[in-house]
Regions:
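Bacterial N-terminal signal peptides that target proteins for export
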Residues: 1-9
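Short, intrinsically disordered, charge-biased short linear motifs at domain edges
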Residues: 5, 30-33, 73-78
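C-terminal motif of bacterial Sec signal peptides marking the signal peptidase cleavage site
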Residues: 15-18
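Bacterial signal peptide processing site
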Residues: 20-23
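Short, surface-exposed binding/anchoring microloops in extracellular/periplasmic proteins
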Residues: 30-61
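Tryptophan-paired
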Residues: 58-111
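Beta-strand-rich cores of mature extracytoplasmic or soluble domains
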Residues: 98-196
C-alpha cells in the first residue's frame, strides 16, 4: 500500500515538473502561414521548344492550396509560333500578387531519346507582378534550354505579363529547369512505378 502511494506521488511530481517548463510569454516555434485569398481559373501554356511536352504541374508552398497544371503542347512551329495547350481547369493562385511567393514547375518532355526525355523541374519560380482584378489566367511558357516562365496574364503593357510577347533571354522571371531525378524514378514515362 505504501509502495502504491509512493509511486502515485512520484508520478504526480513528474507530471507537475513537466508543466513547470511551459511559459505563456515565450514565442512558439510553430509558424502558421498567412492566409491568402485565392482565385481560380484555367491554366494555359505555350511551348517555344523543339520538343513535345506531355504535361506540366505547378505547385505552391505546402498548405497554401496554390497549384494546377495542364499539358499536351506540340513543339514550336517552323514559323516560330509556339505550340499551345488549351485551358485546363482549375489553377488556384493568389488573388493579389505576392512578391515572396515561389512555386515549383514540373513538366514531362519527349526529346526523342531516352537520356534527356523525362521529367524536369524548376524550383523557386516567381510570378511577375500582376493585377488580380484583370486576370486572364495563369500561363506557363516553356523556353529552349529547359527554362520556364509563369505569369498571370493581365494585359500589362510592359510585356512582362503579355502572352503576345515571347519572354526575352534576359527576363529575370525565367527559371532554369533541371532533370527531376525523384519524379523520373517515381513516374517513369509519366506512369507511376508499380510497387512489387
Amino acid at each position: 500500500m505504501k509502495t502504491n502511494r509512493f509511486i502515485g506521488v512520484v508520478v504526480l511530481l513528474v507530471l507537475l515538473a513537466g508543466c513547470a517548463g511551459l511559459h505563456a510569454d515565450e514565442s512558439s516555434t510553430v509558424e502558421i502561414p498567412k492566409r491568402i485569398e485565392l482565385s481560380s481559373g484555367d491554366s494555359r501554356s505555350m511551348n517555344y521548344t523543339p520538343w513535345y511536352i506531355h504535361k506540366f504541374s505547378i505547385s505552391g508552398p505546402k498548405g497554401t492550396r496554390i497549384g494546377g497544371g495542364g499539358g499536351n503542347m506540340r513543339a514550336m512551329r517552323e514559323d516560330g509560333s509556339p505550340g499551345q495547350s488549351g485551358g485546363q481547369c482549375c489553377m488556384r493562385y493568389p488573388m493579389e500578387w505576392q512578391p515572396d511567393l515561389r512555386l515549383t514547375v514540373r513538366w514531362l518532355v519527349d526529346k526523342k531519346n531516352e537520356k534527356t526525355s523525362g521529367w524536369y523541374k524548376a524550383e523557386n519560380v516567381r510570378i511577375p507582378q500582376y493585377d488580380g482584378s484583370r486576370s486572364g489566367g495563369v500561363w506557363a511558357i516553356f523556353l529552349p534550354g529547359d527554362r520556364v516562365k509563369l505569369m498571370v496574364a493581365d494585359g500589362n503593357a510592359n510585356g512582362r505579363n503579355s502572352v503576345a510577347v515571347r519572354p526575352g533571354d534576359d527576363d529575370p522571371d525565367v527559371a532554369q529547369g533541371v532533370p527531376d531525378e525523384e519524379w523520373n524514378y517515381e513516374y517513369p514515362k509519366g506512369v507511376m512505378r508499380r510497387i512489387k
